Amino acid sequence: MAYSWDNRVKYVVRYMYDIDNNGFLDKNDFECLAVRNTLIEGRGEFSADAYANNQKIMRNLWNEIAELADFNKDGEVTVDEFKQAVQKHCQGKKYGDFPGAFKVFIANQFKAIDVNGDGKVGLDEYRLDCITRSAFAEVKEIDDAYNKLTTEDDRKAGGLTLERYQDLYAQFISNPDESCSACYLFGPLKVVQ
């Protein structure tokens, strides 16, 4: 149940983009993402220029997401609307065939997780990313998920490259197979209520 396609898409909305935790996506979430991304990129330092750039990116992203997913045009994208948009625009497709808004989502997420900026998401960064969304009694739970997610080649390379991350993210939101390795992209999942 936790790795079902339905739950994975709910998870993306709830834990990745509904920053203000009101149960839906709206313009405010993307304004908050601009602040968050600026601070993450600056490793805690706030650059007005970087913020202005992130504001522009996030405003454009919200406008594109609203165009793709706000079917009733009320200024809010519900979980159901987001699921419909994913089904319509992403399901069964590779990353390269996704709409621009989804690609920006994915690139920004990679940038936020790649804390050391080496172009790879290693086990240490994966652990840090996982604990920002869920509680774990043992680190082994996270490590086991990382090992299910990654291949031997990924681990030899020092982690997931951007290209590999893009492919896994595309599978996470578009592949209905509950046993695909991409199900572990954001760690051990819980059922989203």
From Swiss-Prot:
Ca(2+) 3 binds at D114, N116, D118, K120, E125. Expressed in tail muscle (at protein level). InterPro entries: EF-hand-dom_pair, EF_Hand_1_Ca_BS, EF_hand_dom. Disulfide bonds: none annotated. Keywords: Allergen, Calcium, Metal-binding, Muscle protein, Repeat. Residues 10-36, 49-72, 130-147 are annotated as: IgE-binding epitope. GO terms for molecular function: calcium ion binding. PROSITE patterns: EF_HAND_1 (PS00018), EF_HAND_2 (PS50222). The sarcoplasmic calcium-binding proteins are abundant in the muscle of arthropods, mollusks, annelids, and protochordates. This is Sarcoplasmic calcium-binding protein, alpha chain. It comes from Penaeus vannamei (Whiteleg shrimp).
